[in-house]
């Protein structure tokens, strides 16, 4: 498991405005919790805690 930005297909983050949206998204994917990080490296994006290794995360490189 790891703490990371959860990713959609093609290495893109989930953009967000509310912590509740990210917490729901993260926990549905097996994480312990999550929140919406504002003005972070990838803008306003969901960050998950203890996300399982089989769930895609944002890695260096472009979002296609």
UniProtKB/Swiss-Prot annotation:
Residues 2-64 form the LCN-type CS-alpha/beta domain. One of its GO terms (biological process) is defense response. Keywords: Disulfide bond, Ion channel impairing toxin, Neurotoxin, Secreted, Toxin, Voltage-gated sodium channel impairing toxin. It holds the Pfam family Toxin_3. Disulfide bonds join 12-63, 16-36, 22-46, 26-48. The keyword Secreted applies. Its main location: secreted. The keyword Repressor does not apply. It is found in: Secreted. Has the structural arrangement of an alpha-helix connected to antiparallel beta-sheets by disulfide bonds (CS-alpha/beta). This is Alpha-insect toxin Lqq3.
